[in-house]
Amino acid sequence: LGIGGMKALEALGYSIDMFHLNEGHAALAFIEKAKKLSAADVNSLKEHFAYTCHTPVAAGHDRFQKKAMQEIMNEAEFNLLKKFGADPDNSDVINLTQLAMNTCKFVNAVAKKHGEVTRAQFSQHRDRIQSITNGVHTHTWISDLVAALLDKYDHTLGGWRKDPKRLKNILLLKDNASFRSELWTAHQENKKKLCSLLKSWRIQPDVFTVCWARRIAAYK
């Protein structure tokens, strides 16, 4: 994943200053970028990599037999892999999470509690692991129609655009029949737009539709 991604970026002519790796699956991106560099330049390259760990579950932390990796990588790649990706619990294993943490300047977990768990799980990196709670960017996540409706009732919400936390005041409108009706109308209009994008699926906006979209992984 990481190697192919880096080659694709190069083939497309992109010049990227900062690479953000989500999970260790993509950690080989650093190897691809570093394999032709001097030792000093390899260390400098770490400044351009950030890593986000999303889960403590084993499926999110790839481990491969060192012998198997040696068979598919050239000498320069494998030497870097051994240096930065050694598994602290098994000398015969390459650990892609360790590779990511050893080669990225910035490392973070996705919640305060997850940060605590990750620091315990990877104690050798304890002092470097920060926590950034997952969330949404309010002004791009809320549709234009709903945003306009919220603006209309902002006298109750209290300035939601400047302080999104004020959206909790929407509970003050739960018994407002006009607001509830307008919110439902906005929701239906958004649903029609979505159905038009998915017209080949023949989804009807007036039919209740349940969707399930997750990655294909055993623990999901």
Language-model features and meaning:
Residues 1-220:
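Catalytic cores of carbohydrate-active enzymes across secretory and cytosolic contexts
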